[in-house]
Amino acid sequence: MKKEEIIQAIKEMTVLELNELVEACEEEFGVSAAAPVAVAGAGAAAGAGAAEEKTEFDVVLADAGSEKIKVIKAVREVTGLGLKEAKALVDGAPKTLKEAASKEDGEAIKAKLEEVGAKVELK
């Protein structure tokens, strides 16, 4: 399989399928896809980092709440996933719905899901 074929196959995957692929790769190769965390060595460096405003957020579904069907419908609207994928995502909460969303997009998604009873976090 050529590199281009692999990239094309990945482009055609849903978010849920990509998540399963990442988990399978982590298990197969004994690695983690989590970004390495830099430790601030000096107090000045930590202060400068705190002054910068975060521009990209991950929208995480923390809990579906009691209105699961409404949450699944809202997740489908927000992510464009099919019914099966959206249900699996909601059932598997906490799960990331959208990565690197702008603050406005993140807040809009959060508001839409909280409106139907879900608990959502911006990280």
Swiss-Prot record:
Keywords: Ribonucleoprotein, Ribosomal protein. Transmembrane segments: none annotated. InterPro entries: Ribosomal_bL12, Ribosomal_bL12_C, Ribosomal_bL12_C/ClpS-like, Ribosomal_bL12_oligo, Ribosomal_bL12_oligo_N_sf. The keyword Ribosomal protein applies. GO terms for cellular component: cytosolic large ribosomal subunit. One of its GO terms (biological process) is translation. GO terms for molecular function: mRNA binding; structural constituent of ribosome. It comes from the Bacteria. Belongs to the bacterial ribosomal protein bL12 family. Homodimer. Part of the ribosomal stalk of the 50S ribosomal subunit. Forms a multimeric L10(L12)X complex, where L10 forms an elongated spine to which 2 to 4 L12 dimers bind in a sequential fashion. Binds GTP-bound translation factors. HAMAP family: Ribosomal_bL12. Forms part of the ribosomal stalk which helps the ribosome interact with GTP-bound translation factors. Is thus essential for accurate translation. This is Large ribosomal subunit protein bL12. The gene is rplL.
